[in-house]
Amino acid sequence: MSKRGPEVSHDGVKSSPAHPATGRHHSMRWHYRDGVIPQPRCPHCRQFVNLDALRCPNCAAELGYHLLNRQFYGVRRGQAIIDGQTWYTCSNRDWDCNWMVWEGAPAGRCFACRLTRRRPDTDDTVALGKLAKTEEAKRRLILQLGDLGLPIVPWDVHDGGLGFDLLSSLTTGERVIIGHANGIITLDLAESLDDHREALRVRLGEPYRTMLGHLRHEVGHYYQGVLLTDERAWTSCRELFGDERASYQDAIKRHYSRGAPDGWQSSFISEYATMHPWEDFAETFAHYLHITGTLATAAAIGIHLDAATNVRDTDVVPLESYRDEPVQQLLSDWDWMSRAFNRINRAMGFGDLYPFQLPAPVRTKLEFIHDLVTHAPLTVDEQVARALPDRAGPAHQRG
């Protein structure tokens, strides 16, 4: 009897072989050659390129990004030969999507674009002009989730699966509330405008507000419902974050009328995290993604801190993955690296790259998130979907 290897869907995402008893496929995860994430380089001149590049800034070669191999390939007439197969540019390339798809991909869309459930109408050219920036942040999020080994079940595969509604309050005149409900993350494209987003950040007293930050926060709500699969896990979560069954609407009213409690800095990562246990989990999850994503980038570039310069016994060498490391190693590396990044930002006249403190209770919460992520099972899609509706909680909306 022959063994079946990993299968590749038309959008370029590899799934595990079907379970021998059920015939069902496991949730999707990236596979890299030799288990190492390749560096983004132009295949022609070998210069480093940004993940969102459509052309090489050095040699001007047209590029397409292959999700499975995590590499750029040269594109000619919208096609590239990859591992002996013909791949095509995503049909959303006009909105700056540089990912590649197989010929049979639904509507010619890549895996990341398939996750977008709603977007502005085609005649809303102003809003669509802002879509590219948000989609870029979303692709970066999807790449990181795959690198962490987290299951991604699309909204069009199962009810409660992950999806995105990317709408615009500026062009429609209707209010768009950023939030999460039953797997669907809603974002306001108006926040891709720097002046609009910065005005909101100042008005709300937030030290950090970006589209990627919104995505990482809202996906934290999604994964709380996915990764906490039994009552024991929920009990452990409640011991750290509080009881999520408390009234969410009452919490909103209390937070916006009274603000965060005095001394919140000793137990929470942000003022918003104090509002409700749902938000504390999502904020902590977002910071876990901030930390691991930044350290992985530093590792990929080759940035490290010399021991002698920093009065340490050993160099600080960030890792691309902390899956096999205790959270204490992750946070120790981050303590040192974040201080260095903050100094670099200040040298350019900017605010701190990471303007947050991590008190002991927050570190314990991050340890809980780390354990959840590093032990996330690649469960079958149906099992993940069944776990979502009962624990999805209320719609989480933030202003």
Protein language model annotation of sequence segments:
Residues D195-L215:
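Short pre-active-site segment immediately N-terminal to the catalytic Zn-binding motif
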Residues R209-T229:
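Active-site recognition of the HExxH zinc-binding catalytic motif
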